Amino acid sequence: LIFPATLNSLFQTADDYYRNERIVTFLRLIRYVAAFLALALPGLYVAAATFHPQLLPGNLIRSMAEARSGVPFPTAAEVLLMELSFELLREAGLRMPGPAGNTIGIVGGLIVGQAAVSANLVSPITVTVAALTALGSFSIPNEELSEVFRLWKYGILLLGSCFGILGVMLGCFLLLMLMAEQESYGIPWLYPYVGGNLNERADEKDSMFLAAARKRKRRPIFAKWGNRIRFRRKS
């Protein structure tokens, strides 16, 4: 079967519809937050540490300065080094057979991060940022979407290291504009956040927030036009 693919559908999983709608709503919010971390956290960290330290609490600035003492690389190079290391570990884990492949990504990341900190190549907070970014990308349900966010992460990191917070915002807006232009079989890729009235706004009840089953009386827009009513009253 071939259906339109939308951003909203790529954040949904099959087991969402076997759980309580409040739990599903919470988990979907976590996925969206994780996607944002996977996309923008490295750029935000570099921008805040390099251009806008006044945005951070004083105690955090002092901790970051103490942690970075002795590190020979600038902040952007630190983050790029750790991100590429995690990408290498991820790729190695995919190529290794059996349970060892699942283990190398987590254990290898901890070992490499600790070794880099001990050698004063990176600071501990940079390892933390890279680990949170990796966890965010793992939390995206769709692997292809996760790869897109991982690729755009480097563009936003470059913009953040050159232009600060403004560069991060510019990168996010460019990605949003590209997504808004896309369509899948005539359906906007940002549906139902864009063009939600195509199905009488029924799909908004199954988006970032999942409404109760009794309120979702219409099937998604992907269903056949004459078969979009889930519940019909007996005549």
Describe the residue ranges of each PLM region:
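Cytosolic regulatory modules rich in charged/polar residues
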Residues: 1-78, 145, 184-212, 225-234
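Hydrophobic alpha-helical transmembrane segments of membrane transport and translocation systems
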Residues: 126, 130-235
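Transmembrane alpha-helix detector for multi-pass membrane proteins
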Residues: 34-53, 68-144, 148-149, 154-160, ...
